[in-house]
Protein backbone atom coordinates (compact mmCIF):
# COMPACT_ATOMS: atom_id res chain seq x y z
CA UNK A 1 0.00 0.00 0.00
CA UNK A 2 1.28 3.47 -0.86
CA UNK A 3 0.55 6.86 0.72
CA UNK A 4 -2.04 7.80 -1.91
CA UNK A 5 -3.97 4.59 -1.27
CA UNK A 6 -4.10 5.48 2.42
CA UNK A 7 -5.78 8.76 1.50
CA UNK A 8 -2.97 11.33 1.22
CA UNK A 9 -2.25 12.58 -2.30
CA UNK A 10 1.07 14.46 -2.21
CA UNK A 11 0.92 15.26 -5.92
CA UNK A 12 -2.53 16.84 -5.54
CA UNK A 13 -1.14 18.88 -2.65
CA UNK A 14 1.71 20.20 -4.80
CA UNK A 15 -0.68 21.08 -7.59
CA UNK A 16 -2.92 22.90 -5.12
CA UNK A 17 -0.01 25.03 -3.87
CA UNK A 18 0.86 25.85 -7.47
CA UNK A 19 -2.71 26.91 -8.23
CA UNK A 20 -3.05 29.22 -5.23
CA UNK A 21 0.32 30.88 -5.78
CA UNK A 22 -0.96 33.75 -7.93
CA UNK A 23 -3.80 34.54 -5.52
CA UNK A 24 -1.47 34.46 -2.52
CA UNK A 25 1.24 36.56 -4.18
CA UNK A 26 -1.36 39.19 -5.12
CA UNK A 27 -1.39 40.12 -1.42
CA UNK A 28 2.37 40.70 -1.13
CA UNK A 29 3.81 44.01 -0.06
CA UNK A 30 7.40 45.04 -0.69
CA UNK A 31 8.20 43.76 2.81
CA UNK A 32 7.74 40.12 1.85
CA UNK A 33 11.20 38.65 1.32
CA UNK A 34 10.07 35.06 0.94
CA UNK A 35 6.55 33.73 1.02
CA UNK A 36 4.75 30.70 -0.31
CA UNK A 37 6.81 27.59 -1.05
CA UNK A 38 9.60 27.98 1.49
CA UNK A 39 9.89 26.43 4.91
CA UNK A 40 9.34 29.80 6.58
CA UNK A 41 7.94 33.12 5.40
CA UNK A 42 10.28 36.09 5.65
CA UNK A 43 8.95 39.58 6.31
CA UNK A 44 10.87 42.82 6.70
CA UNK A 45 9.36 44.73 9.63
CA UNK A 46 8.44 48.33 8.65
CA UNK A 47 9.70 50.54 11.47
CA UNK A 48 9.25 53.97 9.90
CA UNK A 49 7.50 56.41 12.24
CA UNK A 50 7.49 54.00 15.18
CA UNK A 51 9.42 54.98 18.31
CA UNK A 52 8.87 51.72 20.18
CA UNK A 53 7.55 49.10 17.74
CA UNK A 54 5.48 46.26 19.16
CA UNK A 55 4.26 43.19 17.30
CA UNK A 56 0.64 42.21 17.96
CA UNK A 57 -0.58 38.71 17.15
CA UNK A 58 -3.92 36.93 17.08
CA UNK A 59 -5.27 33.54 16.09
CA UNK A 60 -8.81 32.29 15.57
CA UNK A 61 -11.04 30.08 13.47
CA UNK A 62 -14.53 30.21 12.00
CA UNK A 63 -16.11 27.67 14.33
CA UNK A 64 -19.09 25.54 13.43
CA UNK A 65 -20.26 28.08 10.87
CA UNK A 66 -18.07 25.94 8.61
CA UNK A 67 -20.57 23.08 8.85
CA UNK A 68 -23.36 25.09 7.24
CA UNK A 69 -21.02 26.97 4.89
CA UNK A 70 -19.69 23.73 3.44
CA UNK A 71 -23.18 22.30 2.92
CA UNK A 72 -24.34 25.51 1.20
CA UNK A 73 -21.07 26.16 -0.70
CA UNK A 74 -20.10 29.44 0.98
CA UNK A 75 -16.38 28.68 0.70
CA UNK A 76 -15.21 32.13 -0.44
CA UNK A 77 -17.13 33.74 2.40
CA UNK A 78 -15.53 31.63 5.15
CA UNK A 79 -12.13 32.69 3.81
CA UNK A 80 -13.21 36.26 4.56
CA UNK A 81 -14.49 35.15 7.96
CA UNK A 82 -11.13 33.63 8.84
CA UNK A 83 -9.22 36.85 8.17
CA UNK A 84 -11.86 38.96 9.89
CA UNK A 85 -11.89 36.94 13.09
CA UNK A 86 -8.13 37.36 13.50
CA UNK A 87 -7.70 40.88 12.16
CA UNK A 88 -10.57 42.43 14.10
CA UNK A 89 -8.98 41.13 17.30
CA UNK A 90 -5.53 42.61 16.77
CA UNK A 91 -6.74 46.02 15.59
CA UNK A 92 -8.38 46.60 18.99
CA UNK A 93 -4.88 47.54 20.19
CA UNK A 94 -4.43 50.11 17.43
CA UNK A 95 -2.20 47.76 15.45
CA UNK A 96 -1.93 47.73 11.66
CA UNK A 97 -1.95 44.22 10.16
CA UNK A 98 1.28 43.09 8.50
CA UNK A 99 0.86 39.47 7.51
CA UNK A 100 -1.46 36.49 7.76
CA UNK A 101 -1.01 32.73 7.82
CA UNK A 102 -3.63 30.02 7.43
CA UNK A 103 -4.01 26.38 8.36
CA UNK A 104 -6.46 24.15 6.48
CA UNK A 105 -7.14 20.59 7.60
CA UNK A 106 -9.33 18.27 5.56
CA UNK A 107 -10.21 14.63 5.08
CA UNK A 108 -9.67 14.87 1.33
CA UNK A 109 -8.30 17.79 -0.64
CA UNK A 110 -11.28 19.02 -2.65
CA UNK A 111 -9.41 21.49 -4.80
CA UNK A 112 -12.27 23.66 -6.03
CA UNK A 113 -13.65 24.22 -2.54
CA UNK A 114 -10.32 25.12 -1.01
CA UNK A 115 -9.35 27.38 -3.91
CA UNK A 116 -12.44 29.42 -3.08
CA UNK A 117 -11.41 29.55 0.58
CA UNK A 118 -7.94 30.81 -0.35
CA UNK A 119 -9.43 33.35 -2.75
CA UNK A 120 -11.61 34.66 0.10
CA UNK A 121 -8.58 34.92 2.38
CA UNK A 122 -6.56 36.67 -0.33
CA UNK A 123 -9.39 39.09 -1.13
CA UNK A 124 -9.60 40.21 2.50
CA UNK A 125 -5.85 40.50 2.85
CA UNK A 126 -5.55 42.61 -0.32
CA UNK A 127 -8.37 44.88 0.84
CA UNK A 128 -6.56 45.50 4.13
CA UNK A 129 -2.95 45.57 2.88
CA UNK A 130 -2.00 42.40 4.73
CA UNK A 131 0.33 39.86 3.11
CA UNK A 132 -0.34 36.11 3.15
CA UNK A 133 3.07 34.98 4.31
CA UNK A 134 2.45 31.26 4.46
CA UNK A 135 0.11 28.45 5.30
CA UNK A 136 -0.40 24.74 5.65
CA UNK A 137 -2.90 22.42 4.02
CA UNK A 138 -3.10 19.08 5.81
CA UNK A 139 -4.89 16.10 4.28
CA UNK A 140 -5.97 13.92 7.21
CA UNK A 141 -8.02 10.91 6.06
CA UNK A 142 -9.86 9.12 8.81
CA UNK A 143 -9.56 12.11 11.12
CA UNK A 144 -11.84 14.36 9.06
CA UNK A 145 -14.52 13.02 6.72
CA UNK A 146 -13.91 13.51 2.99
CA UNK A 147 -16.25 16.46 2.57
CA UNK A 148 -15.14 18.40 5.65
CA UNK A 149 -12.42 20.95 6.32
CA UNK A 150 -11.42 23.09 9.28
CA UNK A 151 -9.67 26.46 9.26
CA UNK A 152 -7.35 28.36 11.56
CA UNK A 153 -5.85 31.78 10.92
CA UNK A 154 -2.97 33.74 12.36
CA UNK A 155 -2.53 37.50 11.97
CA UNK A 156 0.43 39.64 13.00
CA UNK A 157 0.36 43.43 13.12
CA UNK A 158 2.49 46.27 14.40
CA UNK A 159 1.87 49.20 16.74
CA UNK A 160 3.81 51.84 18.60
CA UNK A 161 4.05 51.02 22.30
CA UNK A 162 3.45 54.68 23.15
CA UNK A 163 0.19 54.66 21.19
CA UNK A 164 -1.22 51.29 22.22
CA UNK A 165 -4.95 51.32 22.92
CA UNK A 166 -5.38 49.41 26.16
CA UNK A 167 -8.34 50.97 27.96
CA UNK A 168 -6.23 52.67 30.62
CA UNK A 169 -7.45 56.13 29.59
CA UNK A 170 -11.14 55.27 29.76
CA UNK A 171 -13.12 57.60 32.06
CA UNK A 172 -16.62 57.75 33.45
CA UNK A 173 -19.15 59.07 30.91
CA UNK A 174 -17.01 58.21 27.89
CA UNK A 175 -19.26 57.19 25.01
CA UNK A 176 -19.57 53.72 23.52
CA UNK A 177 -19.95 53.83 19.74
CA UNK A 178 -21.36 50.73 18.03
CA UNK A 179 -20.39 49.72 14.49
CA UNK A 180 -22.96 47.57 12.76
CA UNK A 181 -22.24 43.90 12.12
CA UNK A 182 -22.82 42.13 8.83
CA UNK A 183 -25.30 39.72 10.33
CA UNK A 184 -24.23 36.77 12.46
CA UNK A 185 -20.49 37.04 11.74
CA UNK A 186 -18.88 33.80 13.00
CA UNK A 187 -20.33 33.10 16.44
CA UNK A 188 -23.36 31.31 17.83
CA UNK A 189 -23.57 28.70 15.10
CA UNK A 190 -23.65 25.67 17.37
CA UNK A 191 -26.93 27.02 18.73
CA UNK A 192 -28.14 27.99 15.25
CA UNK A 193 -27.42 24.54 13.87
CA UNK A 194 -29.42 22.96 16.69
CA UNK A 195 -32.35 25.26 15.96
CA UNK A 196 -32.19 24.32 12.27
CA UNK A 197 -32.02 20.64 13.17
CA UNK A 198 -35.20 20.96 15.22
CA UNK A 199 -37.04 23.06 12.60
CA UNK A 200 -36.55 21.56 9.16
CA UNK A 201 -38.72 24.17 7.41
CA UNK A 202 -36.94 27.12 9.02
CA UNK A 203 -35.56 28.50 5.75
CA UNK A 204 -39.01 28.55 4.16
CA UNK A 205 -40.53 30.15 7.26
CA UNK A 206 -37.93 32.92 7.18
CA UNK A 207 -38.28 33.56 3.45
CA UNK A 208 -42.08 33.69 3.71
CA UNK A 209 -41.95 36.11 6.63
CA UNK A 210 -39.19 38.47 5.42
CA UNK A 211 -38.81 37.76 1.69
CA UNK A 212 -35.11 37.08 2.27
CA UNK A 213 -33.05 33.95 1.68
CA UNK A 214 -32.35 32.40 5.08
CA UNK A 215 -28.91 31.00 4.31
CA UNK A 216 -27.77 34.09 2.42
CA UNK A 217 -28.54 36.13 5.54
CA UNK A 218 -27.14 33.55 7.95
CA UNK A 219 -23.82 33.03 6.16
CA UNK A 220 -22.86 36.61 5.32
CA UNK A 221 -19.12 37.07 5.89
CA UNK A 222 -17.78 38.83 8.96
CA UNK A 223 -17.13 42.53 8.45
CA UNK A 224 -13.51 43.68 8.80
CA UNK A 225 -13.19 47.01 10.63
CA UNK A 226 -9.53 47.86 10.02
CA UNK A 227 -10.06 50.48 7.32
CA UNK A 228 -12.51 52.52 9.33
CA UNK A 229 -10.49 52.26 12.56
CA UNK A 230 -7.34 53.26 10.69
CA UNK A 231 -9.11 56.24 9.15
CA UNK A 232 -10.37 57.42 12.55
CA UNK A 233 -6.91 57.13 14.10
CA UNK A 234 -5.32 58.93 11.13
CA UNK A 235 -7.53 61.96 11.93
CA UNK A 236 -5.85 62.31 15.35
CA UNK A 237 -9.02 61.17 17.06
CA UNK A 238 -8.32 59.39 20.32
CA UNK A 239 -9.91 55.98 20.71
CA UNK A 240 -9.60 54.87 24.33
CA UNK A 241 -10.78 51.30 23.93
CA UNK A 242 -12.07 48.90 21.29
CA UNK A 243 -13.96 45.64 21.45
CA UNK A 244 -14.60 42.99 18.80
CA UNK A 245 -18.02 41.50 19.57
CA UNK A 246 -17.61 37.74 19.15
CA UNK A 247 -18.47 34.70 21.28
CA UNK A 248 -20.21 35.84 24.45
CA UNK A 249 -21.85 38.77 22.71
CA UNK A 250 -21.84 42.33 24.04
CA UNK A 251 -21.95 41.35 27.75
CA UNK A 252 -18.76 39.30 27.58
CA UNK A 253 -16.72 41.33 25.10
CA UNK A 254 -17.41 44.99 25.83
CA UNK A 255 -16.12 44.92 29.44
CA UNK A 256 -12.84 43.36 28.23
CA UNK A 257 -11.58 46.69 26.91
CA UNK A 258 -11.97 48.57 30.21
CA UNK A 259 -10.72 48.13 33.75
CA UNK A 260 -12.80 46.40 36.41
CA UNK A 261 -13.52 49.85 37.92
CA UNK A 262 -15.96 50.56 35.10
CA UNK A 263 -19.09 49.05 33.65
CA UNK A 264 -20.73 49.65 30.26
CA UNK A 265 -24.21 51.16 30.37
CA UNK A 266 -26.07 50.09 27.24
CA UNK A 267 -29.19 51.76 25.92
CA UNK A 268 -31.07 48.80 24.47
CA UNK A 269 -33.42 51.23 22.72
CA UNK A 270 -30.57 52.80 20.73
CA UNK A 271 -30.85 50.29 17.89
CA UNK A 272 -33.20 47.76 16.36
CA UNK A 273 -31.93 44.20 16.59
CA UNK A 274 -31.86 42.75 13.03
CA UNK A 275 -34.74 40.45 12.12
CA UNK A 276 -32.52 37.37 11.69
CA UNK A 277 -31.64 37.38 15.38
CA UNK A 278 -35.22 37.96 16.52
CA UNK A 279 -36.42 35.19 14.22
CA UNK A 280 -33.91 32.71 15.63
CA UNK A 281 -34.86 33.73 19.15
CA UNK A 282 -38.56 33.10 18.50
CA UNK A 283 -38.17 29.84 16.58
CA UNK A 284 -35.50 28.49 18.91
CA UNK A 285 -37.21 29.76 22.08
CA UNK A 286 -33.88 31.17 23.23
CA UNK A 287 -33.92 32.61 26.77
CA UNK A 288 -33.15 36.34 26.96
CA UNK A 289 -29.85 35.90 28.78
CA UNK A 290 -28.60 33.32 26.28
CA UNK A 291 -29.75 35.52 23.42
CA UNK A 292 -27.51 38.39 24.58
CA UNK A 293 -24.63 36.11 25.55
CA UNK A 294 -24.55 34.19 22.26
CA UNK A 295 -25.10 36.60 19.36
CA UNK A 296 -23.72 40.03 18.42
CA UNK A 297 -27.32 41.25 17.80
CA UNK A 298 -26.18 43.61 15.06
CA UNK A 299 -23.18 45.10 16.88
CA UNK A 300 -19.89 43.93 15.38
CA UNK A 301 -17.37 46.29 16.94
CA UNK A 302 -17.34 48.99 19.62
CA UNK A 303 -15.25 52.11 20.23
CA UNK A 304 -14.85 53.93 23.56
CA UNK A 305 -14.32 57.66 23.02
CA UNK A 306 -14.54 61.08 24.60
CA UNK A 307 -17.91 62.62 23.70
CA UNK A 308 -16.20 65.49 21.85
CA UNK A 309 -15.27 63.08 19.04
CA UNK A 310 -18.76 61.64 18.59
CA UNK A 311 -19.85 63.59 15.50
CA UNK A 312 -16.52 63.18 13.71
CA UNK A 313 -16.57 59.42 14.21
CA UNK A 314 -20.20 59.02 13.15
CA UNK A 315 -19.45 61.05 10.00
CA UNK A 316 -16.42 58.89 9.17
CA UNK A 317 -18.49 55.74 9.63
CA UNK A 318 -21.16 57.17 7.36
CA UNK A 319 -18.53 57.88 4.69
CA UNK A 320 -17.55 54.20 4.86
CA UNK A 321 -21.22 53.23 4.56
CA UNK A 322 -21.14 51.60 7.99
CA UNK A 323 -24.07 52.24 10.27
CA UNK A 324 -22.93 53.52 13.67
CA UNK A 325 -24.58 55.00 16.73
CA UNK A 326 -24.10 55.84 20.40
CA UNK A 327 -24.69 52.49 22.09
CA UNK A 328 -24.23 53.77 25.62
CA UNK A 329 -21.64 55.15 27.99
CA UNK A 330 -19.11 54.12 30.62
CA UNK A 331 -20.08 54.23 34.28
CA UNK A 332 -18.15 53.63 37.45
CA UNK A 333 -19.03 50.23 38.82
CA UNK A 334 -20.54 51.57 42.04
CA UNK A 335 -22.87 53.76 39.98
CA UNK A 336 -24.31 50.93 37.90
CA UNK A 337 -27.89 51.09 39.24
CA UNK A 338 -28.65 53.24 36.21
CA UNK A 339 -27.78 50.28 33.99
CA UNK A 340 -30.39 49.34 31.43
CA UNK A 341 -28.47 46.37 30.06
CA UNK A 342 -29.16 43.07 31.78
CA UNK A 343 -27.26 44.11 34.94
CA UNK A 344 -27.31 40.57 36.28
CA UNK A 345 -24.85 39.44 33.61
CA UNK A 346 -22.58 42.46 33.33
CA UNK A 347 -19.12 41.80 34.73
From Swiss-Prot:
The lineage of its organism: Bacteria, Bacillati, Cyanobacteriota, Cyanophyceae, Synechococcales. Gene3D superfamilies: PurM-like C-terminal domain, PurM-like, N-terminal domain. Transmembrane segments: none annotated. The keyword Nucleotide-binding applies. Pathway: Purine metabolism; IMP biosynthesis via de novo pathway; 5-amino-1-(5-phospho-D-ribosyl)imidazole from N(2)-formyl-N(1)-(5-phospho-D-ribosyl)glycinamide: step 2/2. One of its GO terms (cellular component) is cytosol. This is Phosphoribosylformylglycinamidine cyclo-ligase. One of its GO terms (molecular function) is phosphoribosylamine-glycine ligase activity. GO terms for biological process: 'de novo' IMP biosynthetic process; adenine biosynthetic process. It catalyses: 2-formamido-N(1)-(5-O-phospho-beta-D-ribosyl)acetamidine + ATP = 5-amino-1-(5-phospho-beta-D-ribosyl)imidazole + ADP + phosphate + H(+). It is found in: Cytoplasm. Disulfide bonds: none annotated. It holds the Pfam family AIRS_C. Keywords: ATP-binding, Cytoplasm, Ligase, Nucleotide-binding, Purine biosynthesis. Its EC number is 6.3.3.1. Belongs to the AIR synthase family. InterPro entries: PurM-like_C_dom (IPR010918), PurM-like_C_sf (IPR036676), PurM-like_N (IPR016188), PurM-like_N_sf (IPR036921), PurM_cligase (IPR004733).
Amino acid sequence: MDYKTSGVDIKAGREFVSEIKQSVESTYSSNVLEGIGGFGGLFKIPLEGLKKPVLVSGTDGVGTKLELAQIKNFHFEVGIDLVAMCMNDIITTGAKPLFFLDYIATGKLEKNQLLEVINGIAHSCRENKCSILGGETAEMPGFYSKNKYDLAGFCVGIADEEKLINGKKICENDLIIALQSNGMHSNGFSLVRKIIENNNQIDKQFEKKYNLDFYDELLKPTKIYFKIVNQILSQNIQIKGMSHITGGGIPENLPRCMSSDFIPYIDKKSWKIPVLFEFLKDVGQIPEKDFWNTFNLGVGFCLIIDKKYKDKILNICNAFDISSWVLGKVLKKNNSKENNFLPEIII
